[in-house]
Amino acid sequence: MYVGTRRIDKASELIKPEDELEIRGKSNPYASRGGLKLEKAITSFQADLRGKVCMDIGAATGGFTDVCLQNGAAHVYAIDVGYGQFSWKLRNDPRVTLYERTNARLLTPDMLPLHPTVTVMDVSFISIRLILPVAAQLMGEEGVFYTLIKPQFEAGRDRIGKKGVIHDPKVHEDVLREIVEFAPTIGWQGEQLDYSPIKGPGGNIEFLGKITVRTQETEPVTPEIIHELVKKAHQELKGSSHK
């Protein structure tokens, strides 16, 4: 959305009544470009959100919330530490409860009258490992995570390249392995992984994960699976010669 040459990217941004608005670029069926990432996760992991109560942690403009609703979710708790970004349309949707200026690590059951069993997550400047235990406790054993994994916020400064971009596929492998190894420490497991169809800021390759309660019926993701996934992601998104 543009006013003249100025890009409008926040719902809270003020414009004049006489300003002419222009929509540029390819049409997106969701409230943000990020929705395309969760869309792939739902397809890849065969997620069924019909009738489910979901938490969208790191809701921002509402792309993930929009995907949940368009895939049949009964209600979405949209949670974000920021404010003023969330889609006006979604903000006024009775199926959405919006918590702005809210730290997901401080969520308590009394804040969520409807019991969520699905968490979708897209967070920045924090590791998902700090949020998984809280959300897992809120959802209980029937819960499932569909999360975006941003290596640039998982790896630590010593493993990140210039301008916050990770180019080394080995670092991507390490990050995914560390998350898969972390899940069992809270009684969960990394069940499936894929890569995001679009890059993040600066051209960062990002990944998608399905994390569920640990059972004997499902096999966790192995290092070999991670290696092949990262290899494919680099080939598809960067033309890397990762071996």
Predicted regions and their residues:
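Flexible, glycine-/basic-rich loop-and-beta segments that form/coincide
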Residues: 205, 211-243
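S-adenosyl-L-methionine
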Residues: 77-130
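A short glycine-rich, Lys/Arg-flanked "PGG" loop and its adjoining helix->strand segment in the class I
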Residues: 129-146
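Conserved class I S-adenosyl-L-methionine
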Residues: 49-60
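Short alpha-helix
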Residues: 172-186
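S4-like RNA-binding module at protein N-termini
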Residues: 1-49
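Short, glycine-/aromatic-enriched active-site segment of Class I SAM-dependent methyltransferases
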Residues: 151-168
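Conserved SAM-binding loop of SAM-dependent methyltransferases across substrates and taxa
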Residues: 61-72
